[in-house]
Amino acid sequence: MMQLDIFDTSGKSVGKQKLEESVFGVKPNKTLLAQYVRVFMANKRQGTSKVKTRAEVSGGGIKPWAQKGTGRARHGSIRSPIWVGGGITHGPLQKDHSLSLPKKMRKAAFISALSLKASGGDLKILEKLDSKKTSKTKDLNAILKNLELVGNILFVMPEKNDKVLKSGKNIKGLNVSLSENLNTFEVLRADKVLFLQEALEKIQKRYKGK
Protein backbone atom coordinates (compact mmCIF):
# COMPACT_ATOMS: atom_id res chain seq x y z
CA MET A 1 0.00 0.00 0.00
CA MET A 2 1.23 3.48 -0.89
CA GLN A 3 2.10 5.93 1.86
CA LEU A 4 2.63 9.67 1.97
CA ASP A 5 4.12 11.90 4.64
CA ILE A 6 1.73 14.00 6.70
CA PHE A 7 3.01 17.52 7.36
CA ASP A 8 2.15 20.13 9.94
CA THR A 9 1.87 23.83 9.10
CA SER A 10 5.60 24.36 9.68
CA GLY A 11 6.46 21.81 6.99
CA LYS A 12 7.60 19.13 9.42
CA SER A 13 6.65 15.50 8.79
CA VAL A 14 4.49 14.22 11.65
CA GLY A 15 3.40 10.81 10.37
CA LYS A 16 2.38 8.66 7.44
CA GLN A 17 -0.92 8.35 5.58
CA LYS A 18 -1.88 5.15 3.78
CA LEU A 19 -3.28 5.66 0.29
CA GLU A 20 -5.83 3.22 -1.08
CA GLU A 21 -4.53 1.49 -4.19
CA SER A 22 -8.02 1.56 -5.71
CA VAL A 23 -8.10 5.37 -5.44
CA PHE A 24 -4.50 6.57 -5.79
CA GLY A 25 -2.69 3.58 -7.26
CA VAL A 26 -4.45 2.71 -10.51
CA LYS A 27 -2.83 3.07 -13.92
CA PRO A 28 -3.95 6.47 -15.27
CA ASN A 29 -6.16 6.22 -18.34
CA LYS A 30 -4.96 9.24 -20.31
CA THR A 31 -7.41 8.61 -23.15
CA LEU A 32 -10.30 8.78 -20.70
CA LEU A 33 -8.85 11.90 -19.08
CA ALA A 34 -8.65 13.60 -22.48
CA GLN A 35 -12.26 12.65 -23.15
CA TYR A 36 -13.33 14.01 -19.76
CA VAL A 37 -11.62 17.34 -20.42
CA ARG A 38 -13.28 17.60 -23.84
CA VAL A 39 -16.71 16.98 -22.31
CA PHE A 40 -16.03 19.34 -19.39
CA MET A 41 -14.94 22.19 -21.65
CA ALA A 42 -17.84 21.61 -24.05
CA ASN A 43 -20.28 21.90 -21.16
CA LYS A 44 -18.72 25.23 -20.22
CA ARG A 45 -19.66 26.74 -23.58
CA GLN A 46 -22.73 28.97 -23.50
CA GLY A 47 -23.62 28.51 -27.14
CA THR A 48 -25.27 31.94 -27.26
CA SER A 49 -23.31 33.36 -30.22
CA LYS A 50 -25.81 34.39 -32.87
CA VAL A 51 -25.82 36.48 -36.05
CA LYS A 52 -28.71 37.42 -38.33
CA THR A 53 -29.12 35.82 -41.72
CA ARG A 54 -30.58 37.67 -44.71
CA ALA A 55 -33.98 36.33 -43.66
CA GLU A 56 -33.71 37.97 -40.22
CA VAL A 57 -31.93 41.27 -40.79
CA SER A 58 -34.11 44.38 -41.00
CA GLY A 59 -34.45 46.18 -44.29
CA GLY A 60 -36.68 46.61 -47.33
CA GLY A 61 -37.83 43.57 -49.18
CA ILE A 62 -38.15 45.43 -52.43
CA LYS A 63 -35.56 45.52 -55.18
CA PRO A 64 -33.26 48.54 -54.54
CA TRP A 65 -33.33 49.64 -58.20
CA ALA A 66 -34.47 48.40 -61.57
CA GLN A 67 -32.80 45.37 -63.09
CA LYS A 68 -31.81 47.26 -66.24
CA GLY A 69 -31.14 50.78 -67.34
CA THR A 70 -29.27 52.22 -64.36
CA GLY A 71 -25.78 51.04 -65.27
CA ARG A 72 -25.44 49.56 -61.84
CA ALA A 73 -24.86 45.94 -60.87
CA ARG A 74 -27.94 43.81 -60.43
CA HIS A 75 -29.27 43.52 -56.88
CA GLY A 76 -32.41 42.01 -55.48
CA SER A 77 -32.30 43.07 -51.82
CA ILE A 78 -30.35 45.32 -49.48
CA ARG A 79 -30.41 42.42 -47.02
CA SER A 80 -28.02 40.44 -49.23
CA PRO A 81 -24.82 39.29 -47.46
CA ILE A 82 -22.67 41.30 -49.89
CA TRP A 83 -24.24 44.55 -48.72
CA VAL A 84 -23.00 46.52 -45.71
CA GLY A 85 -25.61 45.91 -43.03
CA GLY A 86 -26.89 42.85 -44.82
CA GLY A 87 -27.30 39.37 -43.40
CA ILE A 88 -24.37 37.13 -42.48
CA THR A 89 -23.68 33.93 -44.38
CA HIS A 90 -22.55 30.83 -42.46
CA GLY A 91 -22.19 32.78 -39.21
CA PRO A 92 -22.52 31.32 -35.71
CA LEU A 93 -25.97 30.30 -34.54
CA GLN A 94 -27.25 29.40 -31.09
CA LYS A 95 -26.30 25.82 -30.35
CA ASP A 96 -26.29 23.40 -27.44
CA HIS A 97 -22.67 22.22 -27.13
CA SER A 98 -23.24 20.06 -24.06
CA LEU A 99 -21.90 16.51 -23.98
CA SER A 100 -22.40 13.75 -21.45
CA LEU A 101 -20.18 11.14 -19.87
CA PRO A 102 -21.53 8.06 -18.05
CA LYS A 103 -21.25 8.09 -14.26
CA LYS A 104 -18.82 5.15 -14.20
CA MET A 105 -16.53 6.89 -16.67
CA ARG A 106 -16.60 10.10 -14.61
CA LYS A 107 -15.57 8.14 -11.51
CA ALA A 108 -12.84 6.32 -13.42
CA ALA A 109 -11.53 9.64 -14.76
CA PHE A 110 -11.46 11.13 -11.25
CA ILE A 111 -9.52 8.17 -9.86
CA SER A 112 -7.14 8.30 -12.85
CA ALA A 113 -6.47 11.98 -12.16
CA LEU A 114 -5.74 11.34 -8.47
CA SER A 115 -3.48 8.40 -9.35
CA LEU A 116 -1.66 10.52 -11.92
CA LYS A 117 -0.88 13.17 -9.30
CA ALA A 118 0.13 10.56 -6.72
CA SER A 119 2.49 8.75 -9.09
CA GLY A 120 4.06 12.05 -10.12
CA GLY A 121 4.77 13.11 -6.53
CA ASP A 122 2.35 16.01 -6.80
CA LEU A 123 0.24 15.22 -3.72
CA LYS A 124 0.87 16.54 -0.22
CA ILE A 125 -1.08 16.06 3.00
CA LEU A 126 -1.54 18.67 5.70
CA GLU A 127 -2.42 17.28 9.13
CA LYS A 128 -4.80 20.02 10.22
CA LEU A 129 -5.42 23.72 9.95
CA ASP A 130 -6.02 26.18 12.77
CA SER A 131 -8.58 28.60 11.36
CA LYS A 132 -7.52 31.24 13.89
CA LYS A 133 -3.99 31.17 12.47
CA THR A 134 -5.07 31.21 8.82
CA SER A 135 -7.49 34.12 8.90
CA LYS A 136 -4.96 36.28 7.05
CA THR A 137 -3.50 35.77 3.61
CA LYS A 138 0.08 35.97 4.90
CA ASP A 139 -0.59 33.06 7.29
CA LEU A 140 -1.86 30.77 4.55
CA ASN A 141 0.93 31.91 2.24
CA ALA A 142 3.49 30.99 4.92
CA ILE A 143 2.07 27.46 5.17
CA LEU A 144 2.36 26.97 1.41
CA LYS A 145 5.93 28.26 1.53
CA ASN A 146 6.79 25.88 4.39
CA LEU A 147 5.41 22.99 2.33
CA GLU A 148 7.42 24.18 -0.71
CA LEU A 149 4.31 24.50 -2.87
CA VAL A 150 4.48 26.85 -5.86
CA GLY A 151 2.57 27.30 -9.11
CA ASN A 152 -1.06 26.29 -9.48
CA ILE A 153 -2.05 24.74 -6.16
CA LEU A 154 -5.30 22.96 -5.39
CA PHE A 155 -6.08 23.00 -1.66
CA VAL A 156 -8.76 20.44 -0.75
CA MET A 157 -10.66 20.91 2.50
CA PRO A 158 -13.19 18.59 4.19
CA GLU A 159 -15.70 21.35 4.88
CA LYS A 160 -16.32 25.00 4.13
CA ASN A 161 -14.15 27.51 5.95
CA ASP A 162 -14.97 31.11 5.03
CA LYS A 163 -11.75 32.50 6.49
CA VAL A 164 -9.56 30.18 4.43
CA LEU A 165 -11.66 30.76 1.31
CA LYS A 166 -11.36 34.52 1.74
CA SER A 167 -7.61 34.55 2.40
CA GLY A 168 -7.01 32.01 -0.38
CA LYS A 169 -8.55 34.30 -2.99
CA ASN A 170 -5.67 36.71 -2.51
CA ILE A 171 -2.99 34.14 -3.33
CA LYS A 172 -2.13 33.84 -7.00
CA GLY A 173 -2.46 30.31 -8.35
CA LEU A 174 -4.29 28.93 -5.30
CA ASN A 175 -7.66 27.24 -5.73
CA VAL A 176 -9.52 26.16 -2.58
CA SER A 177 -12.05 23.36 -3.04
CA LEU A 178 -14.16 21.07 -0.87
CA SER A 179 -13.71 17.30 -0.99
CA GLU A 180 -17.39 16.79 -1.81
CA ASN A 181 -17.21 19.20 -4.77
CA LEU A 182 -13.81 18.17 -6.11
CA ASN A 183 -13.77 17.32 -9.81
CA THR A 184 -11.32 15.80 -12.25
CA PHE A 185 -10.62 19.04 -14.11
CA GLU A 186 -9.55 20.83 -10.91
CA VAL A 187 -7.13 18.01 -10.12
CA LEU A 188 -5.66 17.92 -13.63
CA ARG A 189 -5.08 21.65 -13.99
CA ALA A 190 -3.23 21.91 -10.66
CA ASP A 191 0.54 21.55 -10.47
CA LYS A 192 0.29 20.37 -6.87
CA VAL A 193 -2.65 19.08 -4.82
CA LEU A 194 -2.68 19.71 -1.07
CA PHE A 195 -5.16 17.67 0.95
CA LEU A 196 -6.14 18.29 4.52
CA GLN A 197 -5.88 14.83 6.07
CA GLU A 198 -9.61 14.71 6.86
CA ALA A 199 -10.47 15.63 3.27
CA LEU A 200 -8.23 12.87 1.93
CA GLU A 201 -9.87 10.32 4.19
CA LYS A 202 -13.31 11.40 2.97
CA ILE A 203 -12.22 10.93 -0.65
CA GLN A 204 -10.79 7.49 0.10
CA LYS A 205 -13.92 6.41 1.94
CA ARG A 206 -16.16 7.52 -0.92
CA TYR A 207 -14.20 5.91 -3.75
CA LYS A 208 -12.55 2.93 -2.06
CA GLY A 209 -13.04 -0.25 -4.09
CA LYS A 210 -15.00 1.51 -6.85
What residue ranges belong to the model's regions?
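Extended polybasic, low-complexity segments that bind anionic RNA or targeting/receptor surfaces
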Residues: M1-Q46, G91-K210
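Short, structured surface segments that line ligand/substrate-binding pockets
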Residues: Q46-S49, A55
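Glycine/serine-rich anion-binding loops at beta->alpha junctions
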Residues: R54-H90
